[in-house]
């Protein structure tokens, strides 16, 4: 039977290729050399979705996330303060670089904490592994010794995909100088036991004991497969750059065999682009969009939905423009289908319901959450000037267990209007009348008639009733309906167009409508 979701397909593939196990290990990781961006998040959530699928099939899962923070600091990101100071730390381990923003003890840790803080919000709770601690505590001493003792085999595996072969005096390690802390070093000798001699460009020369030193690490293309073996990794995806022909994954799947392990099940995930960014995000973070930024516009459920509803090898854009409205509409439809409020063909229903399940940070609620369209909610938010209590008071039949998610959605709507909505989407209900336009008598008469008509049965009138009345009165007064609509918008929000007028008036309420239009008649 065809699986309901791509995550279920890979869960089955893992169990088939790795065989029955008490626990399956799935892995992800990143070098925290800058703000951990939403492209990095695609790997994390891809692993989480497969982990969920494994758990749903009855398997135990260990989800590890490696902070590759013992990598070299190669380049100063443009969005970091004190560029000159940071430049002095180039070629040192990232964990030694100070946090020039003043948040944490190190630059790397500041980037890590920012990401760790927001992962639980979207239901992701991996076991974090600090690779700098692993190396500085000599945890990998036996693996480093193994690599040195198998230098020839490792060189052959690396040379298979290199245009220029490694030199005879190459060693499968890199060393941070204990004097200047940089990796500007050359390995001079290994005694085939535990002693390694090196020299540094700064002039320092010394011998190190593999069992006790903090200064030796394996280079990336050896470190990665070594950890597959060490952590017993069964699944780890990678980006298209790693999966390119002759890329790091091709090399690593051969090197892991030298370490007497096997490569994990994998897949290639594609890149993410950003559509409609600007304003706050652009000015504060340059070209970097973080999970925090996305969660300001998308609820945790919709954030997960963006990835759960898209195959990992598909490139897609995260939108901050008007497409946000469509994305929320799509999610709401999946929600209605999941709870049986809306029906579709049976062959699609299973897939839709599974996507909705995997979009939830934790368990789906027992009943359907309070549904209100993003566009409609954006009108309500602006009418009530983003006052959440007033918005909740206006909305009917919101149950206590529905409030938290609804409030979160309201906050996302408010953020989107403030930072990304086009200007013609924004409005402010008129509250000052010191510079109002004087209406012609026939327009005054029509507006007065509309007010009187609406006051008679406003509570029971539908949006269609109000719409019909606007057209009726415009025709009776020989006013072109389009011009009459413009006049009403101008009175209410000082613009010639705005939200759908009948619904807009219904939300405003007859008292506020009368208070505004009475100033003109």
From Swiss-Prot:
Gene3D superfamilies registered for this protein in UniProt: 1.10.10.350, 1.10.10.770, HUPs (3.40.50.620), Lysine tRNA ligase, stem contact fold domain (6.10.20.10)
Reaction(s) the record says it catalyses: tRNA(Lys) + L-lysine + ATP = L-lysyl-tRNA(Lys) + AMP + diphosphate
Any single biological process term in GO: lysyl-tRNA aminoacylation
InterPro entries: aa-tRNA-synth_I_codon-bd_sub2, aa-tRNA-synth_I_CS, aa_tRNA-synth_I_cd-bd_sf, Lys-tRNA-ligase, Lys-tRNA-ligase_SC_fold, Rossmann-like_a/b/a_fold
GO molecular function (one): ATP binding
Coiled-coil boundaries: none
Catalytic class of the enzyme: ligase
Keywords of this entry: Aminoacyl-tRNA synthetase, ATP-binding, Cytoplasm, Ligase, Nucleotide-binding, Protein biosynthesis
Cytoplasm among keywords: yes
Motif residue range(s): 'KMSKS' region: 280-284
Main location: cytoplasm
Enzyme Commission no: 6.1.1.6
Short sequence motif named 'HIGH' region, residue ranges: 32-40
Entry annotated with the keyword Ligase: yes
Cellular compartment(s): Cytoplasm
Any single GO CC term annotated in Swiss-Prot or TrEMBL for this entry: cytoplasm
PROSITE patterns tied to this protein: AA_TRNA_LIGASE_I (PS00178)
Family, similarity comment: Belongs to the class-I aminoacyl-tRNA synthetase family.
Name by which UniProt lists this protein: Lysine--tRNA ligase
